[in-house]
Amino acid sequence: TLPQSAGEIPADVFATAVNQVAVAAGKDDSLPTLTGVHIEMNKTTITLAATDRYRLAVKEINWNPKDQNLEAATLLRARTLIDAAKSLAGGGQITFALSPTASNEKLVGFVSEEKTMTSRTLDGSFPPFRHLLPTESTAEAVIEVAPFLDSVRRVALVTDKTVPLRLVF
């Protein structure tokens, strides 16, 4: 059965956020919590976060919860979330459905006008990440995307994948 509805979000906003965050999720199944996207929901925002230990992607989006006192978090496999975003995209609203925390079902559901998807959540805890994000920044850079990506690709050919890319402005 479908879990209880938690709220709604525009399908295109959801799909964009998932695509921006899921790329940072790990691919190593020996670390299952890192193959997932952490989803936090409160009365105003949904926060999506993913990491593979070397990079972190976080996106906050506004939504319309059914319960203004909602505080919930879940961990969903990134591949599942990407598939849900793809198949439910196309306009309209997506309804999020969550199993009650007291239940052992651990299900998340997504409902659009035409489709319904249900998935089990991942076990485990997503690592704390908020302390890694600066509360304010002192600099801002505006760069052209295509030349920047070309430079990164050239550097990637001659560097070790585990060495972070350092940018100096």
Short names for language-model regions:
Residues 1-169:
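Structural preference for solvent-exposed beta-strand-turn elements
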